[in-house]
Amino acid sequence: MQISAYTYTNRGGRDHNEDSLRAAADQGVFVLADGLGGHGRGEVASALAVDALFTAMTQAEALDGETLLDLFQKANETILRQQGKPGQEEMRTTAVALNLTGDTAVWAHIGDSRLYRFSGGELAGVTADHSVTYRKFLGGEISYMDVYHDDDRSRLLRVLGKEPCRPEAGQGSVSPGDAFLLCSDGFWEYVYNEEIQADLCKARTPKEWAELMLLRHIRRTPPGNDNFSLITVFVEALE
């Protein structure tokens, strides 16, 4: 199968960008992180996480869920060591990572950066945010649409840069026509699942898919909006 991808990041209405991302379509490795601005130097934490995960994933001989969870733990240790430096004591970050090898997808995440999976143009799954708001949804206290507007949505329960480090991993089969979206909360809070799916069905390339979604995002974001980043991935049959 042939993999293609498109990456986009924007500081939004903020004075600097605390999101980081890296992608290598030829190796099937994609990583995105969102540093927490209220916890010291979030941009340092997200860059450390992305660099650590991306380097380890591209060098790994084989990746399964347990291996990827171990790589998240090692990335966490890297950030914890960096916290010993002045001004960086409280830095934290979310992270989401995807590996595509053959007909298998392996992913892991921590925090509220998301991975969406699509098969045949239909939503096949989305990671569960590690947030107070998403816990309310899982507990039946609020609806799924309330997740986008709830006051507690930025209160994260799991992050890198803090112990214990408790990422979650998943695995699934991949077929030609499948697609993936990795994104930070600054993006997904303004573009809903059915819209992501509708734009995917219109797009011929990962870039077109991203551009269609970004048009929706731009129309909805208020002044001073958060950084927003995404990686779109297409899996196609070899020509």
Task: Give the ranges of each region predicted by the language model.
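PP2C/PPM-type serine/threonine phosphatase catalytic domain
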Residues: 1-239
